[in-house]
Amino acid sequence: MYRPRSMVSPSRFFNPFMVALIVIITVGLLAMTAGLLIHFLAFDKRAYFYHSNFHILNVDYTEALNSPATHEYRTLSERIESMITDAFRESNLRSEFIRTHVVKLRKEGSGVVADVVMKFRSSKRNNKKAIKTRIQSVLQRLSSSGNLEIAPSNGITSLTDQDTENVLTQECGARPDLITLSEERIIGGTQAETGDWPWQVSLQLNNVHHCGGTLISNLWVLTAAHCFRSYSNPQQWTATFGVSTISPRLRVRVRAILAHAEYNSITRDNDIAVVQLDRPVTFTRNIHRVCLPAATQNIMPDSVAYVTGWGSLTYGGNTVTNLQQGEVRIVSSEVCNEPAGYGGSVLPGMLCAGVRSGAVDACQGDSGGPLVQEDTRRLWFVVGIVSWGYQCGLPNKPGVYTRVTAYRNWIRQQTGI
């Protein structure tokens, strides 16, 4: 009997090309859906900054509230920041609120007014005016907390990102995380990035890096006296700003060099100088001043500090062109002066810092540069000036720095700061 040849039904098998095409389209659609979801959940949000002021009703203004270096200024600012933070964490804005920061405490009558910047993160689609109204509503409910009575301002002002940067760079000691009121604090690696240490200065002799320095105002740089032992003519010197010594962001001539009159090149005592710039620098995100400590500020042994500069990476090596950073710890003078260390050569006006293994240290070319520490409000203070040491990075031979607190009055006498 004739049996026709069986035919393969096209409905039972797919062309491999069609299968691959369907898989690709399906994966693409899933990826697009996931991308849109991520975008709307995360990238759809943006930061909003606001400024307000608060009258502290039960605190009298004193001179101690004139500087962020004092215990009184720091304590009151932290109490105000904590009070505002708690208010938003307990409100319906808890998911939008990021951070607040007291920019300045100022006198009004006999009382104190706190200028405050606040950061929120919300969807770009939200009504900006409605957010502002909700913020104002929370602030109006502030009254007292921890024996602190606050009368909030009747209004708040919206700030652009640039406005916020302009406000916060007028404050001393602000690194990028504070300028953006970020929750992140990252200091890693050995090479600094643009803006990481905005007060770092390269003091250049005939346009070649010779010493480091620290910007302490728009006109003055703090450095070491030994930098000028052989070259004290201001006309030979320039100050540059930025992470690179060969392509700086800014170059300014030096007007005057004021080294400590009692600097001793043998004992290295009083190794401190200030340099007056030929013109004031304009503070920006990447160039602004560090905070000076109070004369009474206590520098605790084993506390973390950072040293920065363009010095050589090994003893006897060449200086580098890109700014380097190193994490060290404060070493007590007693330990530093032990026989295995410096055997009594570390004087009261000096400060030791390093690591036990000796792996991180200042070296040639770092002289005059800053040793800085961060306080509890993320403000940075210069506590030391790179001065001397035995070679570089040896165990039991930490770097020796001029102790800035010991010369706080001298700095004020020379600069008015």
UniProtKB/Swiss-Prot annotation:
Coiled coil: none annotated. Its main location: membrane. It is a single-pass type II membrane protein. GO terms for molecular function: serine-type endopeptidase activity; serine-type peptidase activity. The chain crosses the membrane at residues 18-38. Residues 1-17 are cytoplasmic. The keyword Hydrolase applies. It comes from the Eukaryota. Its EC number is 3.4.21.-. The keyword Nucleotide-binding does not apply. InterPro entries: Pept_S1A_HAT/DESC1, Peptidase_S1_PA, Peptidase_S1_PA_chymotrypsin, Peptidase_S1A, SEA_dom, SEA_dom_sf, Trypsin_dom, TRYPSIN_HIS. Residues 186-416 form the Peptidase S1 domain. Residues 46-162 form the SEA domain. Keywords: Cell membrane, Disulfide bond, Hydrolase, Membrane, Protease, Secreted, Serine protease, Signal-anchor, Transmembrane, Transmembrane helix, Zymogen. Belongs to the peptidase S1 family. This is Transmembrane protease serine 11D. It comes from Rattus norvegicus. The gene is Tmprss11d.
